[in-house]
Protein backbone atom coordinates (compact mmCIF):
# COMPACT_ATOMS: atom_id res chain seq x y z
CA UNK A 1 0.00 0.00 0.00
CA UNK A 2 0.97 3.60 -0.54
CA UNK A 3 -0.05 6.17 2.08
CA UNK A 4 -0.34 9.82 1.07
CA UNK A 5 -0.58 12.01 4.17
CA UNK A 6 -2.08 15.15 2.67
CA UNK A 7 -1.11 18.30 0.83
CA UNK A 8 -0.39 16.24 -2.27
CA UNK A 9 -1.91 19.10 -4.26
CA UNK A 10 -1.00 22.73 -3.60
CA UNK A 11 -4.72 23.47 -3.58
CA UNK A 12 -7.59 21.16 -4.46
CA UNK A 13 -11.24 22.05 -4.76
CA UNK A 14 -13.74 19.86 -6.56
CA UNK A 15 -16.71 21.39 -8.25
CA UNK A 16 -19.44 19.05 -9.42
CA UNK A 17 -17.97 18.93 -12.94
CA UNK A 18 -14.62 20.69 -12.61
CA UNK A 19 -11.37 19.62 -10.95
CA UNK A 20 -8.10 21.60 -10.91
CA UNK A 21 -5.86 21.21 -13.93
CA UNK A 22 -2.14 20.62 -13.65
CA UNK A 23 -2.12 17.27 -11.85
CA UNK A 24 -2.88 14.96 -14.77
CA UNK A 25 0.38 13.00 -14.60
CA UNK A 26 0.09 12.48 -10.85
CA UNK A 27 -3.55 11.46 -11.15
CA UNK A 28 -2.74 9.18 -14.08
CA UNK A 29 0.03 7.43 -12.14
CA UNK A 30 -2.21 7.01 -9.07
CA UNK A 31 -4.96 5.54 -11.27
CA UNK A 32 -2.44 3.22 -12.94
CA UNK A 33 -1.26 1.98 -9.52
CA UNK A 34 -4.78 1.30 -8.26
CA UNK A 35 -5.68 -0.39 -11.56
CA UNK A 36 -2.77 -2.77 -10.88
CA UNK A 37 -4.20 -3.56 -7.46
CA UNK A 38 -2.00 -1.30 -5.34
CA UNK A 39 -3.92 0.15 -2.42
CA UNK A 40 -3.47 3.94 -2.32
CA UNK A 41 -4.68 5.56 0.89
CA UNK A 42 -5.05 9.35 0.87
CA UNK A 43 -5.37 11.32 4.11
CA UNK A 44 -6.50 14.82 3.20
CA UNK A 45 -4.47 17.78 4.42
CA UNK A 46 -5.18 21.46 4.84
CA UNK A 47 -4.31 22.17 1.17
CA UNK A 48 -6.56 19.44 -0.20
CA UNK A 49 -9.30 19.11 2.44
CA UNK A 50 -12.03 19.87 -0.09
CA UNK A 51 -11.64 16.56 -1.89
CA UNK A 52 -14.95 15.15 -3.04
CA UNK A 53 -15.56 11.78 -4.68
CA UNK A 54 -13.52 12.35 -7.85
CA UNK A 55 -10.23 10.87 -6.61
CA UNK A 56 -11.99 7.79 -5.24
CA UNK A 57 -14.25 7.32 -8.26
CA UNK A 58 -11.79 8.11 -11.07
CA UNK A 59 -8.42 7.19 -9.56
CA UNK A 60 -9.36 4.47 -7.08
CA UNK A 61 -7.95 6.23 -4.02
CA UNK A 62 -9.18 5.35 -0.54
CA UNK A 63 -9.96 8.75 1.04
CA UNK A 64 -9.66 9.51 4.77
CA UNK A 65 -10.59 12.93 6.14
CA UNK A 66 -9.73 12.21 9.76
CA UNK A 67 -7.00 10.33 11.66
CA UNK A 68 -7.05 6.53 11.67
CA UNK A 69 -5.27 3.86 13.65
CA UNK A 70 -4.42 0.94 11.37
CA UNK A 71 -2.60 -2.30 11.95
CA UNK A 72 0.21 -2.57 9.41
CA UNK A 73 2.72 -5.43 9.52
CA UNK A 74 1.55 -6.23 13.03
CA UNK A 75 2.13 -2.68 14.31
CA UNK A 76 -0.49 -0.16 15.42
CA UNK A 77 0.04 2.95 13.32
CA UNK A 78 -1.71 6.29 13.91
CA UNK A 79 -1.93 8.08 10.54
CA UNK A 80 -3.10 11.66 9.98
CA UNK A 81 -2.12 14.74 8.07
CA UNK A 82 -1.84 16.59 11.36
CA UNK A 83 -3.07 20.08 10.49
CA UNK A 84 -5.84 20.14 13.08
CA UNK A 85 -4.00 18.47 15.94
CA UNK A 86 -3.01 20.36 19.06
CA UNK A 87 -4.79 23.62 18.15
CA UNK A 88 -6.75 24.12 21.39
CA UNK A 89 -4.57 27.02 22.55
CA UNK A 90 -4.66 28.72 19.14
CA UNK A 91 -8.05 30.40 18.69
CA UNK A 92 -7.32 31.74 15.19
CA UNK A 93 -6.28 28.32 13.87
CA UNK A 94 -9.30 26.74 15.55
CA UNK A 95 -11.57 29.34 13.91
CA UNK A 96 -9.99 28.89 10.45
CA UNK A 97 -10.19 25.11 10.80
CA UNK A 98 -13.90 25.31 11.61
CA UNK A 99 -14.54 27.72 8.71
CA UNK A 100 -12.61 25.75 6.09
CA UNK A 101 -14.19 22.43 7.11
CA UNK A 102 -17.71 23.87 7.05
CA UNK A 103 -20.07 22.09 4.63
CA UNK A 104 -22.01 25.35 4.25
CA UNK A 105 -18.90 27.30 3.22
CA UNK A 106 -17.94 24.52 0.83
CA UNK A 107 -21.39 24.64 -0.79
CA UNK A 108 -21.37 28.46 -1.00
CA UNK A 109 -17.87 28.41 -2.45
CA UNK A 110 -18.84 25.85 -5.11
CA UNK A 111 -21.92 27.78 -6.22
CA UNK A 112 -20.71 31.34 -5.73
CA UNK A 113 -17.08 31.41 -6.84
CA UNK A 114 -15.99 30.74 -10.41
CA UNK A 115 -13.34 27.97 -10.61
CA UNK A 116 -10.69 30.35 -12.03
CA UNK A 117 -11.14 32.73 -9.09
CA UNK A 118 -11.35 29.89 -6.59
CA UNK A 119 -8.08 28.36 -7.76
CA UNK A 120 -6.37 31.74 -7.89
CA UNK A 121 -7.45 32.38 -4.28
CA UNK A 122 -6.49 28.85 -3.22
CA UNK A 123 -2.99 29.12 -4.67
CA UNK A 124 -2.53 32.55 -3.08
CA UNK A 125 -3.65 31.23 0.32
CA UNK A 126 -1.46 28.16 -0.03
CA UNK A 127 1.54 30.32 -0.93
CA UNK A 128 1.02 32.45 2.17
CA UNK A 129 1.02 29.33 4.32
CA UNK A 130 4.16 27.98 2.66
CA UNK A 131 6.04 31.27 3.03
CA UNK A 132 5.12 31.39 6.70
CA UNK A 133 6.64 27.96 7.32
CA UNK A 134 9.45 28.02 4.77
CA UNK A 135 12.14 29.43 7.04
CA UNK A 136 11.17 27.05 9.83
CA UNK A 137 11.45 24.09 7.47
CA UNK A 138 14.85 25.22 6.22
CA UNK A 139 16.19 25.66 9.75
CA UNK A 140 14.76 22.33 10.87
CA UNK A 141 16.62 20.19 8.37
CA UNK A 142 17.76 17.56 10.88
CA UNK A 143 15.91 14.26 10.64
CA UNK A 144 16.17 13.52 14.35
CA UNK A 145 15.94 16.94 15.98
CA UNK A 146 12.77 18.86 15.13
CA UNK A 147 12.90 22.59 14.69
CA UNK A 148 10.87 23.95 17.56
CA UNK A 149 11.32 27.68 17.30
CA UNK A 150 12.76 27.52 20.80
CA UNK A 151 15.60 25.91 22.69
CA UNK A 152 13.26 23.22 24.07
CA UNK A 153 13.88 19.84 22.41
CA UNK A 154 10.94 17.92 20.96
CA UNK A 155 8.22 20.50 21.58
CA UNK A 156 6.64 20.39 18.14
CA UNK A 157 2.84 20.29 18.43
CA UNK A 158 2.57 16.96 16.58
CA UNK A 159 5.12 15.32 18.89
CA UNK A 160 3.26 16.75 21.89
CA UNK A 161 -0.02 15.40 20.48
CA UNK A 162 1.55 11.95 19.99
CA UNK A 163 2.87 11.98 23.58
CA UNK A 164 -0.56 12.82 24.97
CA UNK A 165 -2.39 10.31 22.76
CA UNK A 166 0.03 7.49 23.58
CA UNK A 167 -0.63 7.91 27.30
CA UNK A 168 -4.09 6.38 26.81
CA UNK A 169 -3.71 4.42 23.55
CA UNK A 170 -1.22 1.74 22.54
CA UNK A 171 0.36 2.95 19.30
CA UNK A 172 3.68 1.81 17.83
CA UNK A 173 4.11 4.60 15.28
CA UNK A 174 2.65 8.03 14.49
CA UNK A 175 2.79 9.16 10.85
CA UNK A 176 2.07 12.80 9.94
CA UNK A 177 2.67 14.96 6.87
CA UNK A 178 1.66 18.48 7.87
CA UNK A 179 5.11 19.95 8.47
CA UNK A 180 6.31 19.29 4.89
CA UNK A 181 9.79 18.27 5.97
CA UNK A 182 11.12 14.92 7.21
CA UNK A 183 11.24 14.04 10.89
CA UNK A 184 12.02 10.88 12.80
CA UNK A 185 11.55 11.51 16.50
CA UNK A 186 11.99 8.71 19.06
CA UNK A 187 11.49 8.99 22.80
CA UNK A 188 11.44 5.59 24.49
CA UNK A 189 8.47 3.73 22.95
CA UNK A 190 7.20 6.91 21.25
CA UNK A 191 8.03 7.03 17.54
CA UNK A 192 6.82 9.94 15.38
CA UNK A 193 7.65 10.43 11.70
CA UNK A 194 6.67 13.26 9.43
Where are the model-predicted features located?
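Active-site-proximal loop/helix segment associated with metal-binding centers of metalloenzymes
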Residues: 80-157
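Short, charged/polar low-complexity linear motifs in solvent-exposed/disordered segments
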Residues: 29-30, 60, 75, 95-97, ...
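Conserved beta-sheet core of the metallophosphoesterase superfamily
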Residues: 58-66, 76-78, 83, 87-95, ...
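Core catalytic region of metal-dependent phosphoesterases/phosphodiesterases
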Residues: 1-72
Amino acid sequence: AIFLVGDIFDFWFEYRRVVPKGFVRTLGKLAELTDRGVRVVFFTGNHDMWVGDYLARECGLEIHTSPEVMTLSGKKVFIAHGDNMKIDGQPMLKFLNRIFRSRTLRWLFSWGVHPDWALRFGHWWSGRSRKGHGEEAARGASLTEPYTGSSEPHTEPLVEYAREYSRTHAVDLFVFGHMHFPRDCREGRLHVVN
